Amino acid sequence: MKMTRLYPLALGGLLLPAIANAQTSQQDESTLVVTASKQSSRSASANNVSSTVVSAPELSDAGVTASDKLPRVLPGLNIENSGNMLFSTISLRGVSSAQDFYNPAVTLYVDGVPQLSTNTIQALTDVQSVELLRGPQGTLYGKSAQGGIINIVTQQPDSTPRGYIEGGVSSRDSYRSKFNLSGPIQDGLLYGSVTLLRQVDDGDMINPATGSDDLGGTRASIGNVKLRLAPDDQPWEMGFAASRECTRATQDAYVGWNDIKGRKLSISDGSPDPYMRRCTDSQTLSGKYTTDDWVFNLISAWQQQHYSRTFPSGSLIVNMPQRWNQDVQELRAATLGDARTVDMVFGLYRQNTREKLNSAYDMPTMPYLSSTGYTTAETLAAYSDLTWHLTDRFDIGGGVRFSHDKSSTQYHGSMLGNPFGDQGKSNDDQVLGQLSAGYMLTDDWRVYTRVAQGYKPSGYNIVPTAGLDAKPFVAEKSINYELGTRYETADVTLQAATFYTHTKDMQLYSGPVRMQTLSNAGKADATGVELEAKWRFAPGWSWDINGNVIRSEFTNDSELYHGNRVPFVPRYGAGSSVNGVIDTRYGALMPRLAVNLVGPHYFDGDNQLRQGTYATLDSSLGWQATERMNISVYVDNLFDRRYRTYGYMNGSSAVAQVNMGRTVGINTRIDFF
């Protein structure tokens, strides 16, 4: 198997300062968890909500190796990219990120840290679990949480030695190699871990101009190191984590709208291959202090990202390098213990993001357009969340968040030799709230109702546009009404909900492709029902089934798209999987069969570009060859179903990106301990 040398990256990680991580390996269930949910497990916000939690083994069984594969295990979630992995299109409960690639409707968190929007699609390293919260989460999580939030929780080092290597190969000359080592450096005081990952997912698209036949894929190299200072018998601990990810991609690869089974790009003669290189550095410093009644958490995180991007667009060649910097600080305090009548969470939050973009659109004989832009965005917020346990079966909860948002832009450039430029500043204040009530009908059956708000802040277009002034768009706001239920026993888990979400001042792209600008496009309503169930019908065997039906439309008073469907929102979706364990004299066999159905949806607000219903079937078979060795074979998209993942109008004709089709592979994992 081809391997990539990551030794310099590992050495650099081991030389980082010996500061520790804020997360303990064993936590009281009622404590506030830094790297997962912000609320305690007893709070109304944690119980009066639709949620799904997936463990690391479940992720592995489903072949989820990157965040864009999470829809396989998180019902109702849809993730694709619009052009390339920098610009994710996420929809959940009828709320879509099609409105703004840089301000998603669902924010991705890793160990409590919000990721840059251009880092939403990323490879998964040493994941412990993933949690999806559906519906607006604005009071606890702030901006860009209208549809919900995704929490990715990674494994924290503790006194238990862990280590493994993984390797695998799959279709289109793709491969994956991974190394992890974790455990005590000085038991009772200091713990550490290191993870190295090389993940190659090549494509099979052909550029007839260059002869390249492996376009449309990605190649990622990732390193992560964690240190945790947690003295025994002390009420405090500290931690530090650092990672670096570099991904090369040949996306921005399109075919003709009706040529979804074709491999040749729809591209002008002489056009070069599309190319993108993204590198992201992340650092997190965190701490925790526990008293008899309270637990305090502090987190400070930084992300630096730069990428270069070149792609053909009609007769133009586009070069678009960009730099991002983000820092986040949060201080939280939560009550501790199971016998309290009132549980509380209080927090202070700051997020600052800075971006620089250089862009050049060149014709074969002369420059067409060039520009340089700078944008900033800062959020200062204070929030609280309270739960009143009226009885041992009935609770009510409420939360509020005060947020102050500031943004600025400055840009200049020239178009066919004509200069342009402008600058501007804006600020805005938001007050968000949520109320909920829950009642336990039995020890296993809960019903709840919830009203919650979410928003995306005001701001400016990231990409400068010639001839347009620096005019800010206003904040987009949503309110959600929900009624749900959850039933859970040792053998059966069932949850269902019905919801209505109203969004006003929607932020939506409009204008010519590649020169689109954000503006407020009116209002939209989303209504839907969702169901999720798991039946453990025999020892080692389970059956999962889920489904949803959603109607998400612009209202009649929307200026541009009145009565149209909101783009990137499937009208319905469903999924089912069967997982099992068969004991044999040669080791356990673990079969899995899963089907996923995605309903029709549009890629544009005009509702001209429609992808119809499609279904995919995935299968896998694992073999526990020895106590420490596991081998699995899999076939994703067994029947090679082709479908569009994104599309747009290119002049008078439409082009589309399509999925990769059937993938066959084999993986091996060997544990050290």
UniProtKB/Swiss-Prot annotation:
Transmembrane segments: none
Topological category with respect to the lipid bilayer: Multi-pass membrane protein
Domain TBDR beta-barrel: 160-672
TBDR plug domain mapped to chain residues: 41-155
Induction remarks: By iron starvation. Iron regulation mediated through the Fur protein.
Location of the motif TonB C-terminal box: 657-673
GO molecular function, one term: siderophore uptake transmembrane transporter activity
Signal peptide: 1-22
SUPFAM superfamilies: Porins (SSF56935)
Matches recorded under Gene3D superfamilies: TonB-dependent receptor, beta-barrel domain
Motif (TonB box): 30-37
Protein's cellular compartments: Cell outer membrane
This protein's GO CC annotations: cell outer membrane
Major localization listed first in the record, in broad terms: membrane
Sorted UniProt keywords: Cell outer membrane, Ion transport, Iron, Iron transport, Membrane, Receptor, Signal, TonB box, Transmembrane, Transmembrane beta strand, Transport
Protein name: Pesticin receptor
Source organism: Yersinia pestis
